[in-house]
């Protein structure tokens, strides 16, 4: 399995499975002399970790990160940073029924077909639990971006099912409000509707999809390497690598289909851009405007409603998911998406500095 690393100069490699001993990652390319400790990383992990509200999986994990290397006397040394998070609240017995059968909508079938073996406990490597280490690595990237470039990477939940939040204007989003509710939502009226919907889904044993938006502010002009390493291409690659993500939009995204050129083009004046339909990226290079990325996440297939599938022998079976799962995976995906955007931005910033300045 060779797809465990992302980035060129700022490189993140993750390892571990959902019900293994621990999760871990190696982060290469962190510049030296960045003040860093577990306290800088833990807040983002706490935003992602399970069991923090009635809207997410009841699985409880402390998700306490431990830095193993690359930090000396409170500062990064420029060498590889190793981190681990130990798993604690596994209930592997919940997955005995799917040892020889495939859960519909999951990676069980494709992993088995590709490798001829799979860790069926909680999905193994394909579980979203792996993303905890992406969040840990992303927290380092976010800290460096903020302290050295003034770049802020923040996200919010913009839709669950058919419920959409009120339109948000960059620069006017109340980020304290976003972080004060379990849905990471800036619209109080939508929070109440989200609450009602999730309660209903939990009673039904079903799940729902979601959409979330990440905004990176104060990004300088010039990030991105045309033609194959365009900034928007790398952002899409990173965000599509998140479990359950089925679509990525930059700026207006798919809405551009209905726009005319006279509407979509971001006209310029001596005072700057008049609009930001492009989402802060032109020709694959950052324009200096806020970068806006939106992702769509599918409803999880881990539901208690029986579903048809097959077993290892290709025979028809019925599958009822046991274990503990999120009714909407989009809720805990906000810090994950932030992390992936931050990782890509820091990688491109280091590449830009190496080539252009």
Swiss-Prot record:
Q: Which residues bind NADP(+)?
A: 48, 54
What gene does this protein come from? aroC
Q: Does the keyword Chloroplast apply?
A: no
Q: In which pathway does it act?
A: Metabolic intermediate biosynthesis; chorismate biosynthesis; chorismate from D-erythrose 4-phosphate and phosphoenolpyruvate: step 7/7
Region Disordered, annotated ranges: 38-60
Enzymatic reactions = 5-O-(1-carboxyvinyl)-3-phosphoshikimate = chorismate + phosphate
Q: Matching CDD domains, A to Z? A: Chorismate_synthase
A Gene Ontology BP annotation from the UniProt entry: aromatic amino acid family biosynthetic process
Q: Which SUPFAM superfamilies match?
A: Chorismate synthase, AroC
Source organism of the structure: Haemophilus influenzae (strain PittEE)
Q: Which residues bind FMN?
A: 125-127, 243-244, 283, 298-302, 324
- Give the note describing cofactor binding and stoichiometry: Reduced FMN (FMNH(2)).
Highest rank taxon of the organism: Bacteria
The cofactor named in the record is: FMNH2
Gene Ontology MF terms: chorismate synthase activity; FMN binding
Write the protein's name: Chorismate synthase
EC number assigned by the record: 4.2.3.5
What cellular component GO annotations does this protein have? cytosol
